[in-house]
């Protein structure tokens, strides 16, 4: 379940029977150990930085900008992942995952990272008519169908955009309260049934309830 070398959507035969931890696919539990900020693996592993790679690139660009001029004002927009350092707040539309031409809300931010995640631009239908996308639940290996879009605002001292990027993806499978116990961030979530929720200090609002 994924993409081929031409970046077109493909499924291997019987993919549903071979994906996810419940079907015997390897998980991190027995493959790694955490020692503070050090990750130790017990064998060869493949690391996919797709969940935070674009955000990390934004942070690297910001680091160079800051090194060149510490008081520089800027907005780095990597298409859904932004890092903002401005004197006045900028307004950001929360894109409707069902219709990219419309917004479901707005946010305002002047300092920090603001990242969104949604399968609206990466989805396809298999031969059996199943709707598939790239945001998978590691437990069963199939696309998450309960969440339509997420937005995260974060202002940690370093790697703000990488963190916000990863958290926006993690919200598809992990409750916000569980993530907020480990990371400082604000978020908004739009579910598949068009229900909207947001954390108390999220810097924006939805047009619907």
What are the functions of these language-model segments?
Residues 1-209:
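Mature catalytic core of soluble alpha/beta enzymes
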């Amino acid at each position: 379940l994924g993409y081929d070398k031409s970046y077109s959507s493909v499924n291997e035969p019987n993919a549903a029977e071979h994906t996810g931890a419940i079907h015997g696919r390897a998980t991190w539990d027995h493959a790694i150990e955490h020692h503070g900020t050090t990750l130790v693996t017990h064998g060869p592993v493949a690391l996919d930085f797709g969940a935070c790679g674009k955000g990390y690139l934004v942070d690297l660009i910001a680091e160079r900008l800051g090194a060149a001029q510490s008081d520089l004002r800027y907005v780095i927009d990597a298409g859904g992942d932004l890092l903002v350092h401005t004197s006045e707040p900028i307004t950001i539309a929360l894109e409707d995952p069902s219709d990219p031409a419309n917004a479901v809300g707005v946010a305002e931010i002047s300092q920090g990272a603001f990242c969104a995640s949604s399968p609206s631009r990466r989805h396809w239908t298999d031969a059996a008519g199943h709707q598939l996308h790239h945001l998978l639940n590691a437990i069963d290996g199939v696309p998450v169908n309960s969440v339509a879009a997420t937005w995260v605002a974060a202002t940690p001292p370093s790697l703000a955009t990488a963190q916000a990027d990863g958290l926006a993806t993690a919200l598809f499978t992990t409750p916000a309260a569980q993530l907020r116990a480990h990371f400082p961030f604000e978020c908004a979530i739009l579910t598949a049934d068009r229900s909207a929720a947001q954390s108390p200090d999220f810097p924006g609002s939805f047009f619907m309830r």
